[in-house]
Design a protein with these regions (language model features):
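N-terminal helicase ATP-binding lobe
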Residues: 1-154
Length: 154
């Protein structure tokens, strides 16, 4: 219990210190925008077996082992089912690619990226007009307040 309370107090302290009044941005619980977007795109050729399995088992804890190209990324996003999630990858380049895929292909705006170079990444997006306020997105990523955070293993 102590760790949970300490973690919440730290999060609230960081949130208020950053000038925000809310610790969490609205989640995808009710609209399930990301899940719906993925299903709509895959409607033409259908979900792969691993994607169907994870979508149907979203109330279970799962470990998925599958070769490259089997659809694990979308399967994990379907498994989230609108819940808050952290998608962790080993490399910055991989994190950037998955972030862009989720943001652009599925038009999901409630995703942030957090790694050693994410501040630079957000400012680059701001310069390229992909994002309007890079610093604010970076702060929200650091607060872990968005429904989906793409990050690297430290």
């Amino acid at each position: 219990e102590f760790v949970l309370i300490k973690g919440l107090l730290n999060k609230f302290d960081y949130t208020v210190s950053a000038g925000y009044t809310e610790a969490e941005d609205c989640s995808d619980f009710t609209t399930k925008y990301l899940k719906t977007s993925i299903e709509n795109i895959f409607q033409q050729h259908g979900l792969r077996p691993v994607q169907e399995y994870m979508r149907d088992k979203c109330d279970k804890n799962l470990v998925v082992v599958a070769p490259t190209g089997m659809g694990k990324t979308e399967a994990s996003l379907l498994w989230l089912n609108g819940e808050k999630g952290f998608y962790t990858l080993p490399y910055v380049v991989s994190s950037n690619a998955i972030y862009e895929r989720i943001r652009d292909r599925y038009e999901y705006k409630d995703v942030t990226i957090l790694h050693s170079d994410s501040m630079h990444y957000y400012f680059e997006d701001q310069v390229n007009e992909t994002d309007s306020d890079g610093y604010e997105k970076y702060q929200k990523a650091k607060l872990l307040s968005q429904p989906l955070t793409i990050c690297t293993v430290v």
